[in-house]
Amino acid sequence: MTNALKLTALCNRQNVPVLDQPQLIYVLAEASPGSAIANVRLPLNFSLVLDRSGSMAGEKLHTLREAVKAIIDQLSPSDIVSIITFENKTQVLVPAQPAADREGLKRMVDGIKDGGGTVMGPAIREGLNQVSRYASPNYISRIVLLTDGEATDKLEASMHEADNAGARGIPIIGMGFGSDWKEDFMQEIADRSWLADPGSEAGRVEFIRNPGNALQVFQEVLQSMHVVAKQVTVTFRMVQGLEA
């Protein structure tokens, strides 16, 4: 497929004279998707980690449920999804599986009720466990944490799990709910999952005002993850007399 990838190269010198001594030349190569695969992405492998604690009661939880259903509608059967809920305890609502039955997934989400505290660390750990089951170069793996950030367990527990996610190459995307959401806390979790310094804002965290806002954020995340090739190797073949 000749129009699958576009490859352009730029050299810092247009002409290379013949000299007795070695010369240093810089080449910038840029690969971009061609028209045939411009909208193609690798399948997703992600876990939705949902806060259903007492602090999420009312409008927050309603918005969360509708936001999650809007996200589910964007999935294809080749995507892998798991759904984790948490309050005092962590529950695997949907174990990691292909997103073939979107209507069934949405019915599960509709049944989520609020109650209890916000023990977040174990929930992130379970989300990481579920994503790790399918993690491979053939998938784009992520954890999506939806919460108001009102953790009632030790904050260090969530940070530790974010570090573990970063060590496995599985970033956490944060979606915050409610005007009192803990943005700094969620940002640090996201940053740590990228193995970045706290405050660097390397990770993605967004405040979700309504379900449509969540859908927009998710679509932007999808667009940024349109990976069509991984672990690419570039080979230079030189003419006789030249070495790279």
What do the PLM-derived regions correspond to, one by one?
Residues 231-237:
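Surface-exposed beta-strand/loop patches in extracellular or lumenal glycoproteins
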Residues 94, 240-244:
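Short aromatic-acidic-glycine turn motif
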Residues 1-6:
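Proline/serine/threonine-rich low-complexity linkers at boundaries of modular beta-sandwich domains
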